[in-house]
Amino acid sequence: MKKILLAAVLTGFALSSAYADTVRMGTEGAYMPYNGIDDNGQFIGFEIDLGNELCKRASLDCTWVKNDWDSIIPNLKAGNYDTIIAGMSITEERMKEIDFTTNYTQPDPSKYVALSGASVDFNSGVIAAQTGTIQASFVVESGATLVEFATPDETIAAVRNGEADAVIADKAFLDPIVKESGGELSFVGDSVLIGGGIGMGIRKSDSDLKDKFNAAINSMKADGTLNNLIKQWEIGELF
């Protein structure tokens, strides 16, 4: 597993002076197995390994930047970094603000998790979700009461402390939490498919950068490298 220090620069060729010699990769660092930070302060996860390989294939110098989820799109548009690679599903609403690369994951089923033995009404109950996610929008449309939190860990805590009847999130995120809960938490209800898979967020003005990453993603799909990473990190369906 590749690991890099926070803000460590990858080797490669710079794209152009337009990106100050590096492409800054914005990520949350709080949504394993997609992206996280270990006890040594190093970025880890599926998207970190993926991003490193994409930068290598695109001959780009890249550096990682941590940013909270609730401001991750505004800060991309403000120029704080050049891409978002943070488990962000491609949706029509988000595409009004930013561009996306081609998807690097298939749509991941969303699942509900509740305290084991709990009865949950998905149409009128209280459901926790992370702010600004496709799951939060889905809860609103379902008629249930949405309670939003800035971080995914807070959504789990809301179920444990009784503030929410259940949490909805990507199955790949919830799987290890349920397994490690010692029977305290369980999946409930049916899976829900939302969004068009996950892609890299790019400013609308940076079409050249998007093209470079699209070519790199497609090359990883073609040679099986992307599927290998998806299997390694247990992300979901293969291409």
Predicted regions and their residues:
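Sec/Tat signal peptide C-region and signal peptidase I cleavage site
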Residues: 13-22
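Extracytoplasmic small-molecule ligand-binding "clamshell" domains
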Residues: 21-88
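Periplasmic-binding protein-like
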Residues: 29, 106-111, 175, 179-218, ...
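Short helix-initiation/N-cap motifs at beta->coil->alpha
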Residues: 48, 64-74, 131-132, 147-161, ...
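Alpha-to-beta junction loops
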Residues: 59-61, 77-86, 160-169, 173, ...
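Ligand-binding clefts/hinges and TM-proximal coupling segments of bilobed small-molecule sensing domains
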Residues: 61, 67, 134, 138-154, ...
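A ligand-binding cleft/hinge motif common to bilobed small-molecule-binding domains
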Residues: 71, 88-97, 165-194
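Flexible hinge/capping segments at coil-to-helix
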Residues: 109, 113-128
